């Protein structure tokens, strides 16, 4: 009897360990195939460093194929355009159809820049560190900014769910400017949709509020919480600050020469399109074992 075929969608910090551990547990009797949109692995936690030039792209990426082949794991570098859950197959951008017995979804999210007009690095006015490509664009914009320093706005957009990297980047950004003796020319404002500093989308972690407020003060970074960015224009961000009841507290018009704002996330299109698989934001509904309920 032939063994099962397990397909892992995504080759990031979730997908790669999943593939390795499945192979170690299942041995050679079952086949494992990893499918990823690009042929390289990117170590996402280092993106904030790349965005200010503290790391080179080559230091935080590596080719996926050779790493998986050493373990006897097949690899396909192609975007997935459709998941046929009923037919147990995925369709690739090049037209190929890959059948599976079990599917592991580890694609990561899609960045929903379209939810705030004028945001994002592709046709918008804010930078991102969500991918290595975005971090590279952020670095190029940062180098242009250094030629004519001015105000900077860093933070997270409405609907964002990953706030830690925004704080990390704010401190890295401030430190790099200090090293260049330019910090005094760059007033920094931290704008976040969190109800308070250090909430992190988790209701706080220990004394994260006190620690992060203290560090922001130490770095001379002002902040606006409960912030709803409504629009971004060239050199200007429009922000509505809300009170605890969700009512408008104050309207802000923030000038900037550089801005890095983490976007809200949604499920990637191929995953979100599967009927009954996801919630309205496109994230997979799971049980206590992280298995799909579908």
Question: Which residues fall in each region the model found?
Answer:
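Glycine-rich, N-terminal phosphate-binding loop of Rossmann-like dinucleotide-binding domains
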Residues: 94, 107-108, 156, 241, ...
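A Rossmann-like FAD-binding core segment of flavoenzymes
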Residues: 31-33, 70-83, 98, 174-285
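FAD-site-proximal beta/loop scaffold in flavoenzymes
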Residues: 2, 112, 121-148, 255-294
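Glycine-rich dinucleotide-binding loop and its adjacent helix/turn
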Residues: 107-181
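A conserved beta-strand/loop capping segment in the N-terminal third of enzymes
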Residues: 67-117
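Beta1-alpha1 glycine-rich phosphate/pyrophosphate-binding loop at the start
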Residues: 2-74, 158-203
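Short acidic, glycine/proline-rich loop/turn micro-motifs
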Residues: 44-48, 116-118, 273
